[in-house]
Amino acid sequence: DKGMFFTSLITPAILLVLYATFLGNIYKDSFLSSMPEGFTLAEDLINGLVGGQLMSSILAVSCVTVAFSSNMLMVQDKANGTIKDLSISPVKKSTLALSYYFATLISTLIICYVALAICLLYVSFIGWFISFADVMFLMLDVFLLVMFGTALSSIINFFLSSQGQIAAVGTIMSAGYGFICGAYMPISSFSSGLQKVVSFLPGTYGTSLVRNHSMN
């Protein structure tokens, strides 16, 4: 779906505007309130720190949620019966599964790398303190997270067979994943029991990986 693909390319820019508008001041106030009285930092340094946190939040969430949206094709093929045509063709099931995986991986990588470029451009305007090595690490982080997001969406979508089911799962992932992985709120603010639960989720470590390189 070319229309959906090009619309998805615009989504990171919209997300960045929303994050910077609503979360930027929250992050900034949080940093300022945690500093000792009488201790000050340069404005561009604080802005760079906030920008790095916003960038890590967007990338950590997008790499997984975009993968779910990209992988909707697998469920759509089940819903409209296309999978039956593919099943009777001389193609192994493993080849078909890998085709869905790599198609989702490639489209998600394109969108997420566009998101990374937009985020880096935003950070360059408000306060750039990221080294070239960290930029390379961020590109690697995005690749790893997209592989994880694609694998997770493939596993979950394997059990879905209707448009309603994928819409419900997509809504849940879009609304809840950012909180579960620690992108919107620091895991330290969760209760001790919830902290132990989310520590078993790979997504939390992916968020930490991106945040470490974007705020280094």
PLM region descriptions:
Residues 45-76, 141, 151:
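Hydrophobic alpha-helical transmembrane segments of membrane proteins
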Residues 18-28, 157-213:
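Transmembrane helix segments
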Residues 2-30, 51-66, 109-112, 172-178:
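Hydrophobic alpha-helical transmembrane segments of multi-pass membrane transport/permease proteins
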Residues 93, 101-178:
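Alpha-helical transmembrane segments and their short interhelical loops
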Residues 67-91:
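Transmembrane helix boundary and interhelical loop/hinge segments in multi-pass membrane proteins
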